[in-house]
Curated annotation (Swiss-Prot):
NCBIfam families: PS_I_psaM. Its main location: plastid. One of its GO terms (biological process) is photosynthesis. GO terms for cellular component: chloroplast thylakoid membrane; photosystem I. The keyword Lipoprotein does not apply. The keyword Plastid applies. HAMAP family: PSI_PsaM (MF_00828). The gene is psaM. This is Photosystem I reaction center subunit XII. Belongs to the PsaM family. It comes from the Eukaryota. It is a single-pass membrane protein. Pfam families: PsaM (PF07465). The chain crosses the membrane at residues 5-25.
Length: 30
């Protein structure tokens, strides 16, 4: 079973990964 806490944890990881990807992308383009 998947609990709400596991879903929240997964969303936090996905959000962090997205922010890091955008940050790295901007550094590469500059």
């Amino acid at each position: 079973m998947i609990t709400d806490s596991q879903i929240f944890f997964a969303l936090c990881i996905a959000l962090t990964a997205a922010v890091l990807a955008i940050g790295l992308g901007r550094q590469l383009y500059v």
